[in-house]
């Protein structure tokens, strides 16, 4: 205050809550850094009071605020704060970071696109060693080709891909409520459709040289045939995670 009064220079006083983000030293004075480091390296963590509420700000938001000061976007003597400031219980924090780790096995991603979960996930990944940058996923193969699930979401379905050799047809079923989007990324394919009530048929030809999304529609049986001379590769999104107890997949010839 005296500096501002005596010289006219601007001054800013920040009282920061817990700051988290990449490169923070673990097992020192940041619970986020400690949890991210220890959980990612299969080391134990200690939660004394799961109900204790933390106040946190993200390092990128701190830097953005400080840059505004340096560039003169704030004037006069102030006691500003960094926003957004997040509130999270200690138990919820440990559970969230543990879920990040487990998502590689379940393939079910957390909602990492916005808010504190986005920033915690980026922070968690920054504590992985290079040997942990990649992980394997299951694949399933038969005479038709192979199939692998890549990513599952809690509320927006799942992503997978499959292959088929020349002349191979996959599918031959319909769904009551499940919907799908197909994208052929290598080769050529013919999609066949038949309305299960009226018998109406339809056909779509796609190729990786001219990318096209093909949607399956409830009540229409469908199949996909590789009409090219090399293996076909197709991406597949379904609006729900596959449930073997309720697959919503009924065999029906196209």
Could you describe each region identified by the protein language model?
Residues 2-23, 36-37, 43-52:
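Conserved beta-loop-beta element that borders a ligand/cofactor-binding pocket
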Residues 13, 24-34, 51-71, 91, ...:
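Substrate-positioning beta->alpha
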Residues 68-139:
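Mid/C-terminal beta-alpha module of Rossmann-like enzyme folds, strongest
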Residues 131-172:
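A short glycine-rich, His/Asp/Glu-containing loop-to-beta-strand
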Residues 156, 168-181, 208-210:
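A short beta-loop-beta micro-motif enriched in histidine and acidic residues
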Residues 177-196:
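Glycine- and acidic-residue-biased ligand/ion/polar-headgroup-sensing regions
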Residues 195-225:
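Short acidic-glycine-tyrosine-enriched beta hairpin
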Residues 197-200, 221, 225-254:
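Double-stranded beta-helix
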């Amino acid at each position: 205050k005296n500096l501002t009064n005596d010289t006219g220079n601007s001054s800013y006083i920040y009282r920061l809550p817990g700051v988290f983000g990449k490169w923070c030293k673990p097992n020192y004075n940041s619970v986020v850094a400690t949890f991210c480091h220890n959980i990612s390296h299969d080391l134990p963590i200690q939660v004394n009071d799961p109900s204790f509420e933390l106040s946190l700000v993200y390092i990128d938001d701190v830097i953005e605020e400080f840059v505004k000061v340096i560039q003169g976007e704030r004037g006069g003597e102030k006691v500003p704060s960094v926003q957004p400031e997040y509130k999270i219980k200690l138990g919820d924090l440990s559970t969230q970071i543990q879920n990040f780790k487990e998502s590689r096995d379940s393939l079910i991603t957390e909602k990492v696109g916005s808010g504190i979960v986005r920033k915690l996930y980026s922070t968690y990944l920054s504590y992985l060693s290079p040997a942990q940058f990649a992980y394997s996923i299951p694949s399933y193969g038969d005479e038709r080709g192979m199939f692998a699930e890549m990513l599952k979401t809690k509320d927006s379905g799942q992503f997978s891909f499959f292959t088929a050799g020349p002349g191979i047809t996959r599918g031959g079923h319909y769904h009551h409520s499940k919907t799908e989007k197909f994208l052929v990324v290598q080769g050529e394919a013919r999609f066949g459709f038949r309305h299960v009530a009226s018998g109406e048929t339809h056909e779509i030809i796609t190729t990786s040289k001219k990318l096209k999304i093909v949607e399956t529609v409830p009540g229409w049986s469908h199949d996909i045939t590789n009409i090219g001379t090399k293996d076909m590769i197709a991406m597949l999104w379904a609006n729900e995670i596959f449930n073997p107890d309720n697959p919503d997949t009924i065999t029906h010839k196209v």
